[in-house]
């Protein structure tokens, strides 16, 4: 007789106890926790309004799923919501240890697979090798192209970004502990500061992660204090998300270039960072180091995972010259879970260690 313990089930709980059901995935090592059920309705006429509503009224959901004991300080999540855009198959709000992002490329790559496999888009016709999924992110509509076989996702996913552009180059910033440091700022659905790790006395491939995090965080705080971020479309998008340290190999080569992204509250991306690759391609194109449709490979110094990226066409974002960037990578499922929240648990809303 099969043991009752062999079949996973929820522990005894009161009928009114909140239950949060999720699917967990990762893209290049960076986790994505997708909420299937248990999140209250997120109100608002637009996706950005829904993002504000969730921050103000439902932030306990983020903390419960991202923080310990159910998550960890580097957990990443997605809440699926209806979109006001007629062409969108789904809308998404991105969750992290500090709050809510405007864009997440690794999540889009994972959500492309998820949307196809879980029936959020119409089943592709027989023989279709790639399905299209329109995902409304807070930064705008992003199209994912999902490799498929017999109607199921199979292999890598690629996406086309919102217009990506450069906000500033060769910006001198006074970084405590490092003196004057030259940084570039570019947008790939979120704004990043880019710095060659060597300028901070670090080797991107061999330095301790803690040292890279400390240096990148110092740059982020310095840029926030000394430079105003602006976005032509919305103030909701006008914030510095983090700093990406690179190996400085921005000139075109077929060899991978290595970087690490530190974002939000010192959160470390395990992947090469999809929106960061988008912004870095825009920066390289802006500097004349890259031509349209020249493919580059980007390697995570954290896990060694690789994304590819290329600028596919020119565009505009307000008065900024921009490019649409294609980013490719592969996401994998890791499991499902159902979490309960007991009223008498003093740590029910989560905690973080630093």
UniProtKB/Swiss-Prot annotation:
Tissue: Ubiquitously expressed.
Catalyzed reactions: trans-3-hydroxy-L-proline = 1-pyrroline-2-carboxylate + H2O
EC number(s) reported in the record: 4.2.1.77
Disulphide bridges, residue numbers: none
Keyword annotations of the record: Lyase
Superkingdom: Eukaryota
pH dependence: Optimum pH is 8.0.
Active site (catalytic residues): 104
GO molecular function terms listed in the Swiss-Prot or TrEMBL record: hydro-lyase activity; trans-L-3-hydroxyproline dehydratase activity
Binding site for substrate: 105-106, 269, 274-275
Broad enzyme group: lyase
InterPro entries, per the entry: Pro_racemase_fam
Oligomer status and interactors: Homodimer.
Further details from the record: In contrast to the T.cruzi proline racemase enzyme, lacks the conserved Cys at position 273 which is replaced by a Thr residue, transforming the racemase activity into dehydratase activity.
Its biological purpose: Catalyzes the dehydration of trans-3-hydroxy-L-proline to Delta(1)-pyrroline-2-carboxylate (Pyr2C). May be required to degrade trans-3-hydroxy-L-proline from the diet and originating from the degradation of proteins such as collagen-IV that contain it.
Family of the protein in this entry: Belongs to the proline racemase family.
Protein's name according to its UniProt entry: Trans-3-hydroxy-L-proline dehydratase
Organism: Homo sapiens
Gene name as annotated: L3HYPDH
């Amino acid at each position: 007789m099969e043991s009752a313990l062999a079949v996973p089930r929820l522990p005894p709980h009161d009928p009114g106890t909140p239950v949060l059901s999720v699917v967990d995935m990762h893209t290049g090592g960076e986790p994505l926790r997708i909420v299937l059920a248990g999140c209250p309705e997120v109100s608002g006429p637009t996706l950005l309004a829904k993002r504000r509503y969730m921050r103000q009224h439902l932030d306990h959901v983020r903390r419960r799923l991202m923080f310990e004991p159910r998550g960890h300080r580097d957990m990443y999540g997605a809440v699926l919501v209806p979109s006001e855009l007629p062409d969108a198959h789904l809308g998404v709000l991105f969750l992290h240890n500090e709050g809510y992002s405007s864009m997440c490329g690794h999540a889009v790559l994972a959500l492309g697979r998820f949307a196809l496999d879980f029936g959020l888009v119409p089943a592709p016709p027989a023989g279709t090798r790639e399905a299209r999924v329109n995902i409304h992110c807070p930064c705008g509509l992003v199209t994912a192209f999902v490799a498929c076989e017999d109607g199921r996702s199979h292999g890598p996913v690629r996406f086309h970004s919102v217009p990506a552009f450069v906000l500033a180059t060769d910006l001198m910033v006074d970084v405590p502990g490092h003196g004057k440091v030259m940084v570039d700022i570019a947008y790939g659905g979120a704004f990043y500061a880019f710095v060659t790790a060597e300028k901070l006395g670090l080797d991107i491939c061999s330095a301790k992660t803690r040292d890279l995090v400390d240096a990148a965080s110092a740059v982020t705080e310095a840029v926030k204090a000394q430079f105003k971020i602006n976005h032509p479309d919305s103030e909701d998008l006008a914030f510095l998300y983090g700093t990406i340290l690179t190996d400085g190999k921005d000139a075109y080569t077929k060899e991978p270039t290595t970087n690490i992204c530190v974002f939000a509250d010192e959160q470390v991306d395990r992947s090469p960072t999809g929106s960061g690759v988008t912004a870095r391609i825009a920066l390289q194109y802006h500097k004349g180091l890259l031509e349209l449709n020249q493919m580059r490979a980007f390697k995570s110094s954290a896990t060694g995972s690789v994304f590819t990226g290329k600028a596919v066409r020119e565009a505009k974002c307000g008065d900024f010259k921009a490019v649409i960037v294609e980013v490719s990578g592969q996401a994998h499922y890791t499991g499902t879970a159902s979490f309960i929240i007991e009223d008498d648990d003093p740590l029910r809303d989560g905690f973080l260690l630093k």
